Design a protein with these regions (language model features):
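Extracytoplasmic/periplasmic solute-binding protein
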Residues: 154-163, 168, 192-245, 287
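C-terminal capping/gating helix-and-loop segments adjacent to ligand/active sites or protein-protein/ligand interfaces
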Residues: 153, 326, 364-367, 374, ...
Length: 444
């Protein structure tokens, strides 16, 4: 369905009155946005002029005008609302929200890990808004993947709406494997094959490494869960227990540090977002494998379509059925104390509608947390995405960001291990001591 470039005055009036539900954008390059109807105008929204401040992950806005199109559509149906978009590096958003809430001037809508911000008391409960939404659209909750809904739920109350979902898979260079006469890591390849492949693929004389590494806690958590370990156990009702110093966790870090010491991968930097370094080195042919996300697959396919890209689920490990990848899901929430809750929730409903979710997947490789994702031919026909879809069924949510001090300590332990400052056991014991000083009891 193409964008309507010309709207008659009558249609425009109906649209502004909330009778029209297509909410088409002005941009001629956004004709795909016609996929899916927008929520109708909420007649209970006051016509009083307001400004809605929205904070988004910069990775979603840096190279796309999708959210600008969303704003144009929203302001057309709600002409009394002026939406201001602000983009920040994902890792900085939780602290910015905390400072804004404490200062009494929070933004109206924020993208982030809703489970964690809700647990820290930084988000408004939205059960009433969800209930009203379900009354007008009984399928409202049913459209979202259950694991993503769990990431916007705290103590049986919803604090946001899921936006996207992601996990880690193995991304590899098929040409490198063929040159080395190695079978592709498909099917039930195991951790020991992965290490052996990294060794064979490492060619110092060609400045090529077998594996890429990062110190980012979320990414390293995939190695921990793959080994059957965990860094935090418990629930909001019963309280949480920090388990950084588990022997299984130390074994996972030892496996990684041993490969780094053996020269099978470059020692990662300590800069924030060092996971971006691995992707660039992979594109440059300097590393043959790394654990990457779905957006990495999209970036490679869209910018270098002839790249010999291979994708596989994570390797099997001795942990067998208790092993998993890491699950990530961002959502949109309303910070504690925000003044325009009703309008903010309407904006959230629009942002998570299929009209924007579909092009978000097509253009950004940020896949919506919708049940149709794993069955839609448009995406399942991309064979490189099949391992990603399958891995979503075997991924564990990362919850350590509930406790920033503990998460920082875990990150420091990873760096200490990778830089041979301490053994994995020593580094994790120190992290356990530091992280244990934070509040881990039952949450309010």
């Amino acid at each position: 369905m193409r964008t309507l470039i010309f709207l008659t005055s009558a249609v425009l009036i109906l649209l502004l009155m909330g009778c029209g539900q297509t909410g088409l954008s002005d941009g001629g390059d956004l004709d795909e946005l016609a996929a899916g109807n927008l929520p109708p105008r909420n007649p209970n929204i006051s016509p009083e002029p307001i400004t809605l401040e929205v904070w988004l992950d910069i990775d979603f806005t840096r190279d796309s005008n999708l959210f600008e199109a969303l704003v144009r559509d929203f302001e057309r149906v709600y002409p009394e609302v002026k939406v201001k978009l602000f983009s920040f590096v994902r890792e900085s958003i939780p602290q910015k929200v905390e400072l804004a809430v404490l200062s009494g001037i929070p933004p109206d809508v924020v993208q982030g890990h809703v489970y964690a911000v809700a647990g820290r008391g930084l988000a408004e409960p939205l059960d009433e808004q969800w209930q009203a939404w379900s009354e007008t659209d009984p399928a409202a909750a049913g459209q979202f993947i259950d694991s993503a809904l769990a990431e916007v739920t705290w103590k049986d109350k919803r604090y946001g709406v899921p936006l996207d979902i992601y996990t880690l898979v193995l991304i590899y260079n098929r040409e490198h494997f063929s040159e080395a006469n190695l079978p592709y890591p498909e099917g039930d390849y195991d951790l020991f094959y992965l290490r052996r492949a990294a060794e064979i693929l490492t060619e110092p004389e060609r400045d090529r490494y077998g594996m890429g590494f990062t110190t980012d806690p979320w990414y390293v958590y995939a190695w921990v869960t793959g080994a059957g370990g965990d860094v935090l156990v418990g629930s909001p009702e019963e309280g949480f227990t920090l388990t950084l110093d588990q022997q299984t966790n130390a074994d996972a870090l030892r496996f990684l540090s041993d490969m780094i010491e053996a020269g099978y991968g470059p020692r990662p930097t300590t800069r924030p977002r060092d996971y971006e370094d691995r992707r660039q080195m992979f594109l440059d042919g300097q590393i043959s494998m790394y654990f990457g996300e779905s957006q990495d697959i999209h970036l490679i396919q869209s910018t270098q379509p002839d790249f010999p890209l291979g994708v596989a689920q994570l390797p099997t490990t001795p942990a067998r059925d208790s092993a998993a990848s890491v699950l990530g899901s961002s959502g949109l929430f309303i910070p504690k104390g925000a003044q325009h809750k009703a309008v903010a929730f309407e904006f959230i409903k629009w942002a998570t509608s299929d009209r924007y979710a579909v092009p978000m997947a097509r253009r950004l490789g940020r896949y919506p947390a919708k049940n149709w994702l794993q069955t839609s031919p448009e995406f399942t026909e991309n064979l490189s995405l099949i391992p990603f879809f399958n891995q979503l069924n075997d991924a564990r949510p990362y919850r350590l960001d509930l406790f920033p001090l503990a998460e920082e300590a875990f990150g420091d332990a990873i760096k200490a291990t990778f830089y041979d400052i301490a053994t994995p056991a020593e580094a994790l014991q120190a992290a356990q001591t530091i992280g244990g000083n934070t509040t881990l009891g039952p949450a309010p």
